[in-house]
């Protein structure tokens, strides 16, 4: 049905600034403070409702495409490479048929004859529109690119699309509303109407009170206006009196001004005489000051000459001091270098001294150890000699025993000698 209506619409002639708004999404709508009027469901549950909404969405999509055919017809060069030859050929045929229909509609003569030729031409335009839609729907990319040219749609077409989107929102709300919610909504509206009638009665009562108070206020305003008028009259009299007083004051001021003018002329003459006297005094002071200035200039020149001589002397002395300072700095640098060399040598000597002292300590330790070792060796040699002597004595005694028995005295003497030798060894 929507396509039949748009098929009879003229092609687009001028760009519009309106733009298609997005389809109403029930799940993203802001919360309504009137909760009883808002459906509890946000999605369609029945197949019939989904089919109805899908048909309406498809119709809106097709309407959006059809309303942009006029833009394609007026901008062939811009969109020819995007839409393709088949779509452009169908658009040209549609444009020719639309122009022919417009020419027939513009003619005002022989209306009855034109009606007979207008009906088949209208049907041809419908068919061409459907053909262009079929080609665009078969090429989704071209359809998307064409839908991006929303600024090229006419204001009438945009209003029609907005109406369809609004119809879709109403239909969606109607389909998601259950019978129970519809009854609650009707009851809520009745309560609102009843409350509205009560509020209207209160408003009427308040309006009546307001009218009475306005009457009272108007009466008070009239009284205040009367008082204001009285005050204005009094003010007029005061102004008149003040004008007379001002005139008298002005006359007195003029008389005083004349008297002051005569007195001022006398003072001016006196002041002029004083000026002449002061000018003569000024001339005398200038002459005196010139002589003093010349003397001061001579003194200043002398002082400047002395200062210049002192500056030259100071520069000379400072140059000599600077040379001495440079010489001292050179000597200081040399001494500093020598000091660094001495520090380096001192560091080397300290390291050598530490090394020698460590070597001496090591040698002394070795010498002490050698002496201790020698003492131990001497003691060991002494012990070895003592044991060896004891061994020889014992071996001699054993040899004597083997030779035979000797005299008892001899044995006793031998034993005594052995005991003495053993004691001596010990």
Swiss-Prot record:
It is found in: Cytoplasm, Cytoskeleton, Flagellum axoneme. The keyword Protein transport does not apply. Residues 409-426 have a biased composition (Basic and acidic residues). Keywords: Cell projection, Cilium, Cytoplasm, Cytoskeleton, Flagellum. One of its GO terms (cellular component) is ciliary basal body. Component of the nexin-dynein regulatory complex (N-DRC). Interacts with CFAP52. This is Dynein regulatory complex protein 10. It comes from Macaca fascicularis (Crab-eating macaque).
């Amino acid at each position: 049905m929507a396509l039949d209506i748009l098929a009879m619409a003229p092609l687009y002639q001028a760009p519009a600034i309106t733009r298609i708004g997005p389809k109403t999404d029930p799940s993203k709508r802001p919360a309504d403070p009137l909760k009883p009027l808002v459906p509890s469901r946000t999605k369609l549950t029945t197949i019939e409702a989904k089919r109805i909404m899908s048909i309406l969405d498809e119709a809106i999509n097709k309407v959006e495409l059809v309303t942009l055919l006029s833009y394609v017809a007026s901008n062939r060069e811009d969109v020819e490479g995007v839409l393709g030859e088949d779509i452009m050929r169908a658009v040209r045929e549609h444009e020719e048929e639309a122009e022919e229909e417009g020419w027939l509609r513009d003619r005002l003569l022989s209306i009855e004859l034109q009606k007979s030729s207008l009906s088949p031409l209208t049907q041809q335009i419908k068919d061409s529109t459907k053909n262009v839609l079929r080609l665009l729907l078969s090429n989704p990319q071209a359809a998307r690119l064409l839908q991006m040219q929303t600024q090229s749609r006419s204001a009438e077409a945009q209003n029609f699309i907005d109406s369809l989107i609004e119809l879709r929102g109403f239909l969606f709300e109607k389909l998601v509303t259950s019978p129970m919610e519809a009854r609650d909504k009707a009851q809520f509206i009745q309560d609102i109407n009843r409350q509205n009638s009560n509020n209207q009665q209160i408003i009427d009562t308040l309006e009546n009170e307001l009218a009475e108070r306005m009457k009272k206020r108007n009466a008070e305003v009239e009284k205040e206006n009367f008082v204001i008028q009285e005050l204005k009259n009094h003010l007029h009299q005061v102004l008149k009196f003040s004008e007379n007083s001002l005139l008298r004051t002005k006359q007195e001021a003029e008389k005083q001004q004349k008297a002051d003018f005569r007195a001022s002329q006398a003072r001016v003459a006196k002041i002029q005489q004083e000026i002449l006297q002061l000018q003569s005094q000024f001339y005398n002071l200038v002459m005196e000051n010139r002589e003093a200035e010349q003397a001061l200039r001579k003194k200043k020149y002398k002082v400047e000459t002395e200062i210049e001589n002192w500056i030259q002397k100071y520069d000379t002395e400072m140059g000599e001091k600077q040379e001495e300072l440079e010489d001292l700095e050179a000597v200081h640098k040399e001494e500093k270098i020598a000091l660094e060399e001495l520090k380096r040598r001192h560091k080397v000597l300290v390291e050598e001294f530490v090394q020698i002292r460590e070597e001496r300590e090591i040698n002394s330790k070795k010498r002490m150890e050698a002496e201790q070792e020698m003492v131990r060796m001497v003691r060991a040699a002494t012990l070895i000699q003592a044991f060896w002597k004891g061994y020889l004595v014992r071996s001699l005694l054993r040899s004597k025993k083997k030779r035979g028995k000797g005299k008892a005295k001899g044995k006793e003497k031998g034993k005594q000698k052995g005991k003495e030798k053993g004691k001596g060894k010990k």
